[in-house]
Amino acid sequence: MALLRGVWGVLSALGKSGADLCAVCGSRLRSPFSFAYVPRWFSSTLSGFPKKPMTSYVRFSKEQLPIFKAQNPDAKNSELIKKIAELWRELPDSEKKIYEDAYRADWQVYKEEVNRIQEQLTPSQMVSLEKEIMQKRLKKKALIKKRELTMLGKPKRPRSAYNIFIAERFQEAKDGPSQVKLKTINENWKNLSSSQKQVYIQLAEDDKVRYYNEMKSWEEQMVEVGRNDLIRRSMKHSAKKDTEEC
């Protein structure tokens, strides 16, 4: 199971979909939500749901990001987000209010539209499809969250030694079906000596340090722009402790 999770992570990082077969198990790699069955009529109803409005800061970031990218074409997204966050902090309250008012107005329209669509469903339909509704919402919420975090420049999670090895060898492998490549690479990993594996173990440790430092900096930025909801519990506890000591 751990191997499947590892391969799924690598395929995702390489832009592969769940349609790629796992060389080890020979079955399709499924998304955690792929088991959910949603009737066609209900899918069409949910697809008509409006998107949640962007928060004031996200709206501001989305407007500014293309401008900053044009001015700094070689800069990383995380660097640009940091500059945008600084610009947002310095923005006068009167200008911030424009974005906040726009968010409140969009939220009101969003609620009204959702209520209108929900009223079209009969009570029996709502009861019988309660689980499917929840799964659909969770999937959509996870996708929105992922896109938002990407736009906000959240650092990528550290990779394991095995994932680093696969990513490296996958790009070097000859053209062919993904499942064949993965099977070959997996066998190569098993045949590595302890000293050879140690190289990738060290790279994984270095990646953990990179992730820790980038996350610390990123979470500090999120606190500054009022996105405490994105902060890990350990970070919140540490910040609270520092405040009490002061």
Swiss-Prot record:
GO biological process: mitochondrial transcription; positive regulation of DNA-templated transcription; regulation of transcription by RNA polymerase II; transcription initiation at mitochondrial promoter
Coiled coil feature spans: none
GO molecular function: chromatin binding; DNA binding, bending; mitochondrial promoter sequence-specific DNA binding; mitochondrial transcription factor activity; transcription cis-regulatory region binding
Keywords: Activator, DNA-binding, Mitochondrion, Mitochondrion nucleoid, Phosphoprotein, Repeat, Transcription, Transcription regulation, Transit peptide
Residues bearing PTM Phosphoserine: S56, S61, S160, S193, S195
Transit peptide location on this chain: 1-42
DNA bind region: 50-118, 155-219
Compartmental location: Mitochondrion; Mitochondrion matrix, Mitochondrion nucleoid
Residue numbers of Phosphothreonine PTMs: T122
Post-translational modification: Phosphorylation by PKA within the HMG box 1 impairs DNA binding and promotes degradation by the AAA+ Lon protease.
PROSITE patterns reported for this sequence: HMG_BOX_2
UniProt site (Intercalates between bases and promotes DNA bending): V58, L182
Pfam families: HMG_box, HMG_box_2
Protein origin, superkingdom: Eukaryota
One GO CC term on file: protein-containing complex
Quaternary structure, from the entry: Monomer; binds DNA as a monomer. Homodimer. Component of the mitochondrial transcription initiation complex, composed at least of TFB2M, TFAM and POLRMT. In this complex TFAM recruits POLRMT to the promoter whereas TFB2M induces structural changes in POLRMT to enable promoter opening and trapping of the DNA non-template strand. Upon metabolic stress, forms a complex composed of FOXO3, SIRT3, TFAM and POLRMT. Interacts with TFB1M and TFB2M. Interacts with CLPX; this enhances DNA-binding.
Domain note: Binds DNA via its HMG boxes. When bound to the mitochondrial light strand promoter, bends DNA into a U-turn shape, each HMG box bending the DNA by 90 degrees.
Function: Binds to the mitochondrial light strand promoter and functions in mitochondrial transcription regulation. Component of the mitochondrial transcription initiation complex, composed at least of TFB2M, TFAM and POLRMT that is required for basal transcription of mitochondrial DNA. In this complex, TFAM recruits POLRMT to a specific promoter whereas TFB2M induces structural changes in POLRMT to enable promoter opening and trapping of the DNA non-template strand. Required for accurate and efficient promoter recognition by the mitochondrial RNA polymerase.
Protein name (record): Transcription factor A, mitochondrial
Gene that this sequence comes from: TFAM
